[in-house]
Curated annotation (Swiss-Prot):
Keywords: Cytoplasm, Lipopolysaccharide biosynthesis, Nucleotidyltransferase, Transferase. It is found in: Cytoplasm. It comes from the Bacteria. The gene is kdsB. GO terms for cellular component: cytosol. It catalyses: 3-deoxy-alpha-D-manno-oct-2-ulosonate + CTP = CMP-3-deoxy-beta-D-manno-octulosonate + diphosphate. SUPFAM superfamilies: Nucleotide-diphospho-sugar transferases. Its EC number is 2.7.7.38. HAMAP family: KdsB (MF_00057). This is 3-deoxy-manno-octulosonate cytidylyltransferase.
Length: 250
């Protein structure tokens, strides 16, 4: 049974930290194919891979994916999926889930959760978070933190430690890391990418701040399951390969 949302996977070849990572293999299957398979398990109405790279497109077609060739000038994955929406026949209220192309073990339940979350709110965007489990994670600028209202809407996203524990600098209770999985209404996605970057976004290098800056809400639910590591470096790939061996006893 399919659910009433669509998944688009932005698939960029020229990653700054690990070019070609989506074509690397985990037990004989490329990263991008594993992401695609996990997205299918969420039972969306469609799964589309958006890429500007011929080899990624060819591989995706070989394993049966629908592929849309996009511009090579996009600065973000959000811009890339917006091009797919603009080219397609999506209705304004269709739910579009942006699944990153470097998450080979993304849990289908999280994809379903973020899509369902959007249907429970007037906010045009939804995303997820997870409790921070150490001071090291809290103070890591590569881990994006989020603070929320009592009804689960984002107050702010930052690379800094937020909220700041004034009386105990070693505390990390009530802190959450952002999970980079988004659901958008199709019409809002197209509107969002038409806006110029805002000052906060440029300072933090976090494009979701453009939404808050512009006066719109982002719903942020705590994930129903802990997310697994994405692949940003060669070291991450080695860990992912070992995770597969350990989990499936290959």
């Amino acid at each position: 049974m399919s659910h009433n949302f669509h998944v688009i996977i932005p698939a960029r070849y020229h990653s700054s930290r690990f070019p070609g990572k989506l074509l690397q293999e985990i037990n004989g299957i490329t990263v991008i194919e594993r992401v695609y398979r996990q997205a299918l398990l969420a039972e969306p109405m469609s799964v589309i891979i958006a890429t500007d790279h011929d080899e990624i497109a060819d591989r995706a077609i070989q394993f049966g994916a629908e592929v849309v060739i996009t511009s090579h000038t996009h600065q973000t994955g959000t811009d890339r999926i917006a091009e797919v929406v603009a080219k397609g026949s999506f209705a304004p209220d269709d739910v579009i889930v942006n699944v990153q192309g470097d998450e080979p073990f993304i849990r289908p339940q999280l994809i379903q959760q973020v899509a369902c979350s959007l249907t429970k709110t007037k906010a045009p965007v939804s995303t997820l978070c997870w409790p921070i489990s150490s001071l090291q994670i809290l103070n890591n600028p590569n881990v994006v933190k989020v603070v929320r209202t009592r009804d689960n809407h984002a107050l702010y996203f930052s690379r800094s430690a937020i909220p700041f524990h004034r009386d105990d600098k070693n505390a990390y209770s009530n802190t959450f890391r952002h999970i980079g999985l988004y659901a958008y209404r199709a019409a809002f996605l197209l509107e969002f990418v038409s806006w110029p970057p805002c000052t906060l976004e440029q300072i933090e290098c976090l494009e979701q701040l453009r939404i808050l800056w512009s006066g719109f809400s982002i719903r942020v639910e705590e994930a129903c399951e802990e997310p697994l590591q994405d692949i940003n470096t060669k070291e991450d790939l080695i860990l992912a390969q070992q995770y597969f061996l350990d989990t499936f006893n290959v």
